[in-house]
From Swiss-Prot:
Name of protein: Glycerol-3-phosphate acyltransferase
Subunit and interaction comment: Probably interacts with PlsX.
Entry GO CC: plasma membrane
Source organism (scientific name): Pelagibacter ubique (strain HTCC1062)
Upper taxonomic lineage: Bacteria, Pseudomonadati, Pseudomonadota, Alphaproteobacteria, Candidatus Pelagibacterales
Places the protein is found: Cell inner membrane
Length: 191
């Protein structure tokens, strides 16, 4: 029964659509009508309000950190259930008819909560790719892939949950992948 409570509460917290909420409150607009139509931090940056974009990023990370850290210290056997549930909540939020963000910021929160080093693997991979390409989408895909690859090669660690999350991140970026392939993807300005 505990795992169901962990899964449901983590999903519900993960499903809070902060990009949607902040854009509605501060810009009186629906973020789904701006840029890519996505509710995540990168699209929140496209609103032209950097503070709103960074606030969305921080809150999307935090909504994963809270349940995962709580479970890590109170129900450690369920940490991957909490992680995947928070992630699925962000990507498929009940509040927005299961049309959510791409999951990257939530993934980062999960990584840092489970193991700071895993978070650093993602951040370093993301940063190097971004410095070279200026594509947030490509950087997110590379960073998301590097975590399970690192675990498989160096740690002999159960990486199935990280592989599942990478596959979902790849799925949520499928239009970006098409644009990258066709050299039509928009570069991102983060500062």
């Amino acid at each position: 029964m505990e795992y169901l409570i962990v899964a449901l509460s983590s999903y519900l917290l993960g499903s809070i659509p902060f990009g949607f909420i902040l854009t509605k409150i501060f810009l009186k607009k629906d973020i789904r009508d701006i840029g890519s139509g996505n509710i995540g931090a990168t699209n929140a940056l496209r609103t032209g309000n950097k503070t709103l974009g960074y606030a969305t990023l921080l809150l999307d990370i935090t909504k994963a950190v809270l349940p995962v850290l709580y479970v890590k210290f109170n129900y450690p056997d369920y940490i991957f259930i909490a992680s995947l549930s928070a992630f699925l909540g962000h990507v498929f939020p009940i509040w927005l008819k299961f049309k959510g963000g791409k999951g990257v910021a939530t993934y980062v929160g999960i990584l840092f909560s489970i193991n700071i080093f895993l978070g650093l693997v993602f951040i370093i991979s993301w940063a190097v790719t971004f410095l070279i390409s200026k594509y947030s989408s490509l950087s997110s895909l590379v960073g998301s892939l590097m975590v399970p690859m690192y675990l498989i090669v160096f740690e002999n660690y159960n990486s199935i949950f990280f592989i599942i999350m990478f596959v979902l991140i790849f799925y949520t970026h499928r239009e970006n992948v098409k644009r990258l392939k066709n050299k039509e993807e928009t570069k991102t300005k983060i500062y």
